[in-house]
Structures are given as structure tokens and as C-alpha cells.
Amino acid sequence: EQFYLTFPLLLLFVSKYGRDILVRVLGAIALLSLVGCIWMSALDSSTAFYLFPFRAWEFLIGALLALGLFGSARTLQGRTASSVIGLLLIAASVMVFDDMTPFPAANALLPCAGAMLLIRGGADTPVGRLLSTGPLRFVGRLSYSVYLWHWPLIVFVNYAVIMPLAL
């Protein structure tokens, strides 16, 4: 929520100096946030996970992507490669990370880079078409609601069953 309050104000203030300055400022803030995230993760991973300054870089790479900083592959083959690599990075994060993986730390780069490459690839790639199928769109529409409700449901079930759940 803090991002959606501060980012428009930052855009309002900085964009009047031109796109190049905007990209540089956003890039500098993203880099500082990433370095801070890695540093804070070593000290207190909960603080790094929950506090906005240490996660702002994740939002800002999306903003920089929207501003075209990372360019776009011109050919369908290039966009397909981007989306396949992105999907593989996200899948690797899901399969390799466990409860012992330091996170966010530098490990957050893997799924964030994957998401960036996947978005950069576009919807007209085979991966984009796969992710646009009905069942996956259904899951996508539900995912944020499930994310918001999963913890209260786990706590309720744990309380109702009176036995800890192995997560």
C-alpha cells in the first residue's frame, strides 16, 4: 500500500525533469532498495520481508519495465525465449526454495527477474497463450484472494482442529 501512496508523488515530482532523469532516479532507488534488502535480510529477514523500503525494488523493476528500460525483443523468437526463461526462473524458485532459503535477500532476484522476463515476452508467445487459457486465467483471478485469505484460514483451522498443521 505504501508504494501506491508514494510512487505517484515521486512520479509527479521527478517526471517533470524528463524521462531520462525519471529512469535514473527510479533505477537508483531500486538499486538502493535491493542492496538494503540484501543487507537487512542478513540482519533480520522479517524486517526485510515486511518493510516497504526493502521490497520497493520489486515494484520499481516493474515500473522500469513499463518505461521500456529493459527493451523488448523485436522478434517472436526473442520474445518467446524471454518468456520461456522467465517461466523457468519462476518455476525454479518454486521448486528450489524451501523454508531454509534466505528470503527475500538476493534470492528474490530469481522470481522477480522471471516475472520481468515473462511480462517482457508478451501475450503473443506460446507461453503467453498458455498462461491465457481458461483454467490458468481462473487460477490467476483467484490467486490474490487466496493469498489474502490463506493465513486467516490456516489460523482458524489450526484453532478449530487444536493441532498444529505441518506447513
Features from the language model and the residues they span:
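Hydrophobic membrane-embedded alpha-helices
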Residues: 1-167
